[in-house]
Amino acid sequence: MRIDMVTIFPEMFAGPFGDSITKRAVDNGILDIHFTNFRDFAEDKHHHVDDSPFGGGAGMVLKPEPMYKAVRDVLARTEEYADNRRVLIMDPSGPAFNQAKAKELAGYDQLVFICGHYEGFDARIYKLADEAISLGDFILTGGELPAMVITDAVSRMLPGVLGHEDSAPTDSFYAGLLEFPQYTRPREFEGMAVPEVLLNGDHAKIAQWRREQSLLVTKKYRPDLLDKAELSDKDKKFLADNE
């Protein structure tokens, strides 16, 4: 997968993308990440990318010309991805990102992230994007942090990125539910013991316990997810029995 970040702060990505899973994905040729600084496409000698808003108001608004030139430059240089790419604008007006969206985006060959800053975008910039995405109902200084988060979540869905091929399907939210409790050595710590079912080697019982615990954890902390999760009749009966 190719990822293009259109940003005026490409240096912000060095830390998060320079370590851990994302770096390994890049090193293994699974991810190919590029940066385009839209300040380089500013038309005046001072390379201004923002201006005061028409009608007055606080803050500065990103100008359309540099962004249009930058995004069009990226798209022109990567025409081989044109049939299977998505242009995303990081904006709090967009729907909140979730695991289902991560799985969807993992199916594209190229993702182009438009990262804003300052007060916001000139409204005409939104026409460059296929969709807007947010991390939730709060404001961040710029679009770089959401772009990093989304890249991390999407990259975990790509074959070969995680150490174990079954890691992603057992992650929290992968099946629409929160993850079951996890345990490791020692078997007992300060009077707290690992559930016996995890120690007996019966994989069918372990799978059942994990599913039931996932249902209980979701019910306790995010009951809203149960309305959208794919629940079997057995799941529904278990939840009803544990009201």
What would you call each of these model-derived segments?
Residues M1-R77, L199, A204-D227:
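N-terminal nucleotide/polyanion-binding subdomain common to many enzyme families
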Residues D4-V6, H34-T36, L88, L111-V112, ...:
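Hydrophobic/aromatic beta-strand patches that form the interior of the parallel beta-sheet core
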Residues D19-I21, A102-L105, K127-A129, A147-V149:
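Short, glycine/charged-enriched secondary-structure capping and boundary segments
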Residues K63-F113, D122, P159:
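S-adenosyl-L-methionine/SAH cofactor-binding core of RNA-modifying enzymes
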Residues G116:
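Phosphate/anion-contacting hairpin/loop surfaces
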Residues F121, I125-D171:
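Structured adenosyl-cofactor binding patch, chiefly the S-adenosyl-L-methionine
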Residues L145, M157-N200:
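Internal, active-site/partner-interface "lid" segment
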Residues D224-E243:
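Charged phosphate-binding loop/patch that engages nucleotide di/tri-phosphates or the phosphate backbone
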